Amino acid sequence: MRMRHKPNLIPRMERCADWHVKEPEALRGKWREAFPEYKELRLELGCGKGRFTCEQARRCPDMLLLAVEKVADAMVVAMERAEAEGVGNVRFMDKDAALLPDMFAPGEISRIYINFPDPWRKTRQYKRRLTAPEFLQKYTALLPEGGQVWFKTDNRPLYEWSVESFTLCGWKLEPMPEGTPMTDYEAKFTEQGLPIYRVVATRPTVPPEKLPDVSEIPVPAAEEQEDEEE
């Protein structure tokens, strides 16, 4: 479902400037130098309205959570939420996940959260999924040895496709612990009694420079899904 355009977007973002990183590319390789008070940096791809973001940051005060959300109308709501709730160990970036290598050097991020991403239902769109092999290769380069991706979705075909994609790319899979923070979507789906599919994937042990070319990794087969009504 598309968000409605937020009125006064620019002034609202300016009021939350302390939470907004406008040029993350300038901090590539320098994040720990810029934020020395935090023991680790974690990344969230697609923060939506920030419910998960703020709760996860509160639970881990010695961690800086960097939330990437390409839809500025959603991101401003998340920033306002962080400001209102006094959550200081989170920063937001209105960028596309495809640009992650421009923003972070290898090994800078200890963990990546992907919560309820766009399933990109059409066959021609599968490579745009955040769990497609091309993205997984990017994550492997960004994460240190033992680094993980925590993935949640309500879309079973996407989940099954993602599990196969992780496996093809050499990631080790394990169940996600219970009691992780919820997104707004997750809370709504849980209230309705709908299933949520979760998995934790640990990056391959192969050094990033020895990763196979992404063109050598097959894209998992999947049936095209029908679009949901908005």
Model-predicted segments: where are they?
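Conserved beta-strand signature within the Rossmann-like core of class I S-adenosyl-L-methionine
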Residues: 146-153
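Class I S-adenosyl-L-methionine
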Residues: 160, 164-230
